[in-house]
Regions:
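Helix-loop junctions and terminal segments of transmembrane helices
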Residues: 50, 54-91, 98, 145-150
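Hydrophobic alpha-helical transmembrane segments in multi-pass integral membrane proteins
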Residues: 25, 169-173, 224-239
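Transmembrane helical elements of multi-pass membrane transporters/channels
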Residues: 4-71, 134, 138-141
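Membrane-proximal transmembrane or re-entrant/amphipathic helices at the cytosolic face
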Residues: 230-280
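Residues that define the loop-to-transmembrane-helix transition and helix capping
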Residues: 42-45, 88, 122-125, 154-155, ...
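Interhelical loop/hinge segments that connect adjacent transmembrane helices in multipass membrane
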Residues: 1-28, 68-85, 206-220, 266-271, ...
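Short runs within selected transmembrane alpha-helices of multi-pass transporters and secretion channels
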Residues: 20, 24, 28, 51, ...
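Alpha-helical transmembrane segments of multi-pass membrane transport and lipid-handling proteins
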Residues: 61, 87-138, 169-177, 234
Length: 280
């Protein structure tokens, strides 16, 4: 009977995840139709290209972290305090890994677009700038939202994702209507700020979740560095953009290395990887 009950709850969970995934796809499809009708087919291509860059490279990091993070969170799912500690730890590590990459992305996005596509796609830079800032909020909300899966609350997970998809679509429609492609980047940032507030309050009310002081410190420092990078690309002319940008990237890398070393011993990990390559 216990096995049947567990199997049933897993089936319900799987169904809810699939359903929320379907709603996300429908929202993305409706947005593409709107862009095509309001703007043109070229803008649909530009939109897809911009978010492919962001989602592909950042998504790889999320996937790699998720394979290790979800099983560990599932083990402590019944203990709210341990869940809180693990979510904070994962949020810290996600930010420490992502922040230098995102800041480098802000500074060198033009080159990335030209290398991956062509100079004809440079009209998406504004959209990518704003969306890159949104990844900071996506990373943290991603770490929190996993707790709904770990605790097996399928309905809560579904409604959380459902409302997220609804306002993501609404903000994207408004963003494109009033701001074109750049407006889509701004709407991405706003949507993930709201989504983070949403998952934080659900986790706080249901599981007494709160952010640790060390997480807040990392978030503020790395986000301020990213904001400085954002200001540099918007306000300062080349080649000074790259000079100041490299300084910001260097500081972010140094800070991330220092913090990661105290948490997971990153120096030993790097040495281990290098030794494996030497043996090959």
């Amino acid at each position: 009977t216990k096995t049947v009950a567990e199997g049933k709850s897993m089936m319900v969970m799987g169904f809810m995840i699939s359903l929320s995934g379907l709603i996300t796809l429908i929202a993305a499809y409706l947005l593409r139709i709107f862009i095509n009708r309001t703007g043109n087919v070229a803008d649909v291509g530009f939109y897809s290209a911009g978010f492919t860059i962001i989602n592909t490279y950042v998504g790889m990091i999320f996937t790699a972290m998720g394979t290790d993070y979800y099983p560990r969170l599932s083990v402590v799912a019944s203990d709210d305090e341990q869940c809180k500690q693990l979510i904070n730890q994962q949020s810290e590590i996600a930010l420490l890994i992502l922040a230098p990459i995102l800041i480098a992305f802000l500074i060198f996005v033009n080159w990335a677009i030209i290398i991956l596509y062509s100079s004809q796609f440079l009209s998406i830079t504004g959209m990518v700038y704003w969306a890159t800032m949104g990844i900071f909020f996506k990373a943290v909300s991603w770490a929190i939202a996993f707790v709904f899966l770990a605790k097996g609350v399928g309905k809560l997970y579904f409604w959380n994702e459902f409302f997220g998809s609804i306002y993501f679509l609404l903000f994207s429609l408004l963003g494109y209507y009033y701001g074109g492609l750049t407006g889509l980047g701004v709407s991405f940032l706003i949507s993930y700020i709201l989504y983070l507030i949403q998952v934080f309050f659900i986790a706080k009310v249901k599981y007494e979740f709160s952010f640790s002081p060390s997480f807040m410190q990392i978030f503020v420092i790395q986000f301020l560095l990213a904001m400085a990078g954002f200001a540099v690309v918007y306000l300062i002319n080349q080649p000074y953009t790259y000079i100041l940008g490299v300084i910001l990237i260097g500081f972010s890398c140094w800070y991330s290395y220092k913090e990661l070393e105290s948490r997971i011993g990153v120096k030993e990990i790097i040495q281990g990887v290098l030794e494996k390559f030497k043996k090959k």
